[in-house]
Amino acid sequence: RKVVYKQRKRKTTTSLKDRSFRKDRGYKEFLEYIAANKSVYVVEMDTVEGAKGTSPCFLTMFFRNCSLMLMFLLEEQTQKEVTRIFDHLTELLGIELFQKLFEVILTDNGHEFQDRQSLEYSKNDEVRTRIYYCDPNRSDQKGALEKNHEYIRYVLPKGTSFEKMTDKTTLLLLNHINSEKRDSLNGHSPYEVSRLLLDNRLHNCLLYTSPS
């Protein structure tokens, strides 16, 4: 794939009244893009909040083709923290693998996702993904991920603080979720199916294993 460069400045805040981040990247455009590019991986993205008044939260990413979920502990629900994870993944996987796995990401209009430029471009100003946004108040448009969050809530019910969570315990929880066998996957787990459908360097880099 040809690497594209573009000069840009990273922002740390975006006005909630400023909807320019959605320009040409709404749900309608998302449907048009995946219809024209049927082989792309589609990833749904969201955050899961802890107890009210606490800062830590989870960033979740869900591969539609195999139901594999990624989950990262954020210190706070901010654009800066989400960008930190994107930059970390880019460095860990390499720009070409990141582009392959995360070509298209669908998310909501949360303030932590509104700096589209910092997510779409790497620190070296290389295009790494395309971010699209659900229509306002239409979380059902990324309903597969919303449904998958129920597995998190089985262990950490709504209102539970994530302040005692660590990267290690987050990964442990995630590995158990991804190893849960699903009727929707013909009795297989997301982990098993993802080993067949996704580049296994993703599993190797992020230490994904199937708990025994």
Identify the residue ranges that each predicted region occupies.
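Basic, flexible linker segments flanking DNA-binding modules
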Residues: 1-35
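An active-site-proximal beta-strand-loop segment
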Residues: 23-66
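Active-site beta-loop-alpha junctions of metal-dependent nucleic acid enzymes
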Residues: 51, 71-96
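Short small-residue beta-strand/loop micro-motif enriched in glycine and branched aliphatics
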Residues: 67-72, 158
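Acidic/histidine-rich, metal-coordinating catalytic segments
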Residues: 99-115, 136-137
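Charged alpha-helix within mobile-element recombinases
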Residues: 121-122, 128-207
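Conserved small/polar residues in nucleotide/adenosyl-binding loops
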Residues: 208-212
